[in-house]
């Protein structure tokens, strides 16, 4: 009798997953525009599958949703601008998500941008750390070579993977990262469009963005150099630009073969025509994987 009940519960769980026939994705605001392009192209190219639904919510928020369990009411893929943490994998496993497939999709840089009618900045990581953690009121108090301009930093909130990379690579924080609390830092829980609106309001504001978002808004923004390097696809690819990071999505292995099209979507995303040199994602600002990296990631999906 006990084995019958266990089998019945398993059958109900599987059938509830089968009740949904479209891929559901959430997570990183940085990955969002890339995933949206791929989802639309995937829907157009594969008539047998429905167009995936892509949402945002930040890397941490997406992974949190991803780890809520398996079934039709949970997402299939989490986009992330950082690697998943061990504690998140543990949380996933506790909810039955034990087969987490990590897929690296390319690279992006974190840039510091301001309005085009504002001062130009030539920053170092030390300048950025002093502005975020110190008590200077103007940039030239940190370094006389910097503009005499009020410090106002618009940064991603803690639900974004960009925030963690910013703290680690720009501010030099290893674990805890106490920031100034005097109103000169504004944290944005929403996406980059919200950061952009803050810059539109305040000429002094310097915003933290992904390179791809800046590339899409060059008519409105100017970008700072960091350690003497201008952020670009080339300087990120070569490693010259100091604040860059790989981008990922995470697949719920338990849903592969149950929710239609997950494997095909991932392979389509990683295909050279979708995310390689000269591809739609390359043109949208994603720095492509090299050939060996692409081959390695595709091997995970066989």
Regions found by a protein language model. Name each.
Residues 19-302:
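Exported/periplasmic ABC-transporter solute-binding proteins
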Residues 1-8:
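Sec-dependent signal peptide recognition
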Residues 8-11, 292:
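N-terminal low-complexity, Ser/Thr/acidic repeat segments characteristic of secreted
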């Amino acid at each position: 009798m006990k084995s019958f009940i266990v089998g019945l519960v398993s059958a109900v769980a599987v059938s509830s997953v089968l009740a949904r026939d479209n891929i559901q994705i959430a997570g990183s605001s940085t990955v969002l525009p890339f995933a949206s392009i791929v989802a639309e192209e995937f829907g157009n190219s594969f008539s047998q599958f429905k167009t995936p639904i892509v949402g945002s919510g930040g890397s941490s928020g997406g992974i949190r949703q991803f780890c809520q369990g398996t079934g039709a009411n949970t997402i299939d893929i989490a986009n992330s601008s950082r690697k998943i943490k061990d504690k998140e994998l543990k949380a996933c496993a506790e909810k039955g998500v034990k087969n987490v497939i990590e897929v690296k999709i390319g690279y992006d840089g974190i840039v510091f941008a301001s309005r085009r009618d504002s001062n130009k900045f030539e920053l170092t990581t030390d300048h950025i750390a002093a502005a975020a953690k110190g008590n200077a009121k103007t940039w030239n108090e940190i370094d006389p070579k910097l503009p005499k301009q009020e410090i106002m930093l618009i940064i991603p909130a803690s639900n974004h993977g960009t925030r963690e990379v910013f703290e680690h690579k720009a501010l030099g924080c290893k674990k805890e990262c106490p920031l100034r609390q005097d109103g000169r830092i504004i944290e944005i829980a929403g996406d980059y469009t919200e950061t952009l609106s803050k810059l539109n309001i305040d000429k002094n504001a310097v915003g933290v963005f992904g390179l791809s978002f800046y590339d899409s808004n060059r008519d409105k923004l100017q970008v700072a150099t960091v350690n003497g390097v201008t952020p670009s696809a080339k300087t990120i690819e070569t490693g010259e630009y100091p604040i860059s990071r790989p981008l990922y999505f995470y697949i719920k292995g338990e849903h592969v073969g149950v929710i239609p099209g997950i494997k095909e979507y991932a392979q389509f995303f990683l295909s050279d025509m979708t995310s390689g040199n000269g591809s739609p994602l390359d043109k949208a600002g994603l720095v492509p994987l090299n050939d060996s990296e692409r081959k390695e990631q595709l091997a995970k999906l066989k």
